[in-house]
Design a protein with these regions (language model features):
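Low-complexity or membrane-interfacial segments used for flexible interactions
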Residues: 2-17, 22, 32, 37, ...
Length: 324
């Protein structure tokens, strides 16, 4: 070809390498040798947990409100509810009776219906609210009659939920009747009769017999059998001076006996030293120590006996204030 001159080959330079066709053809991709496993979160290193890192907001971001649930309280006592009061009484060795303070009563001088709360104490669960007790009586009876002789009905309600604290929410568990008794010159002796509200079956009664000096109460079961005698010494400061400052700062003991000879006490009902609120009101507190072999029904009657002791010796009505 004209105008084209071939490049002479250099005999000392090897010819370029010639690439042949591939020996094998690429095949299709096979399945992976191992299947992917579940996701494993990173392990804690040096006590640092990346999963507990709180979300970081901007500086000055308001924190969400934190709701703290506190147990209900009464008079500084934290308590819980129970579902079966008789089963709780079967395991309980004692209860605390707290009277609700009536500040309006101190201001007006008019006697108000009494209210009490009964707590069972457990080393594992603390204080357990068992019952709420409220007096139902006429205004004329409260203002004109002494507390140890006036007539009233007391409804003892089992408190299983916070709704049971409402007086009209549920029916009473125990109904206690205290008939009017003219105790002047020991003509009639006061008594309190307890019945189960649901079945109207008698639970028992507590009666205060005539004694010369020392106060005494007799506890009878539903069949009329005398089960316990509750006896107190008249020479106690809290009993002789019950309505003044010295009496409120003293404990009063009423021992529980089984026999007429009062040989060995098996329990006690103790009026506790007044708290700061009880010093300026007529409210009182009682500790009831049950006998070890007492049945739940007998323990219920001992609670009623503690309420009766309050009315007979430590409840100062409006008529008592006028007589002083």
């Amino acid at each position: 070809m004209e105008g084209y001159t071939s490049v002479p080959q250099n005999p000392n330079v090897p010819p370029p390498m010639q690439y042949g066709p591939p020996q094998t053809q690429p095949g299709p991709y096979g399945p992976p040798q191992t299947q992917p496993g579940p996701y494993v979160p990173p392990q804690n290193v040096g006590g640092y947990n990346s999963t507990n890192i709180p979300p970081q907001g901007y500086q000055g971001q308001p924190m969400p409100p934190v709701t703290v649930v506190h147990p209900p309280t009464f008079g500084g006592i934290q308590y819980v509810y129970v579902q079966d009061p008789m089963a709780e009484l079967a395991m309980s060795t004692g209860v605390l009776i707290r009277q609700q303070a009536q500040f309006l009563e101190q201001i007006t001088g008019c006697e108000s219906p009494n209210r009490y709360y009964v707590f069972s104490q457990s080393p594992q669960a603390g204080m357990k609210l068992l019952f709420k007790c409220k007096e139902y009586s006429s205004c004329c009876m409260r203002q004109c009659c002494p507390a140890n002789s006036r007539e009233f009905n007391m409804y003892i309600k089992h408190i299983a939920t916070v709704n049971d604290l409402d007086e009209n929410f549920s029916a009473p568990f125990i109904t206690v009747q205290k008939p009017f008794k003219c105790t002047c010159c020991c003509l009639e002796r006061p008594e309190m009769i307890a019945t189960f509200s649901g079945t109207s079956q008698p639970c028992g009664r507590i009666k205060q017999p005539y004694t010369c000096c020392d106060p005494e109460f007799s506890l009878y079961d539903s069949s009329g059998t005398k089960k316990y005698i509750i006896h107190g010494d008249c020479c106690q400061c809290g009993l002789c001076c019950s309505n003044n400052f010295c009496g409120k700062l003293s404990e009063v003991f009423f021992h529980i006996y089984r026999d007429e000879n009062l040989t060995a006490p098996v329990g006690a009902i103790i009026k506790k030293v007044a708290t700061a609120t009880e010093l300026i009101t007529s409210a009182d507190s009682y500790q009831v120590n049950f006998p070890l072999d007492a049945s739940p029904q007998e323990k219920m009657l001992l609670i009623v006996a503690g309420l009766m002791i309050d009315y007979q010796f430590f409840e100062q009505s409006s008529s008592d204030n006028r007589n002083d």
